[in-house]
Amino acid sequence: TCSTTMPLRYSDFNFGTKLRQNEEAVSERKDWIGTEKERLNRLMAAECDGIITGLYEYWCCYQPFFPTKTTFIPFPIVVGDEPKIAPEPPKQLNLFIGISRNRSVYKGTDIMLRAAEKVKADYPERLNLKVVTGLPFDEYVRTMRGSDAIMDQLYSYTPSMNPLEAMAHGIICIGGGEPEHYALLHETTLRPIINVLPSYESCVSALTQLVTHL
């Protein structure tokens, strides 16, 4: 759907009405469109009694075709103990970026990293940047703790499991937090995510605003 009817302004597969042509997006389309995977997906969607979508993007793609059996249930997260947050803001922001091997361009962490490096160069005394690559989820979470903010999910309207885990530990998320996501949650007040558009300029602007207003 993201490659044909394109209900999203941007996604892993499109910018507006244009298909993304990066290697990962092209590979994903070849893997799904016109293949046994697609046929199985269509069969399951047609014959099942209900479709549970965990992200706005999934809901947006399934609901128009299956309006009576598509239900949105947000991804769950184990909150655990209340995070310990220092009473005073830090003098230097500890920013964490986790990079998945071979999916950096697809997920936009390449752009987020360039933006973070730019802000680090402009405000070296205000930003401490920690970058990790290819960590298993448990190790990712352990390494992320102690950070003040993370950058993740550039092409998403919503937070995935990594940003949700971060926020459960009191860590600021810079990434996907579009109004449509909050509307589906019926949330009219809280906006915990620093939303960025899928561009280098938007990431630089948002991070600069954060580090200069600690």
Predicted feature descriptions by range:
Residues I172-P179:
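Short hydrophobic beta-strand element within catalytic cores of glycosyltransferases
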Residues R145-T158, I171:
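Acidic donor-binding loop of glycosyltransferase active sites
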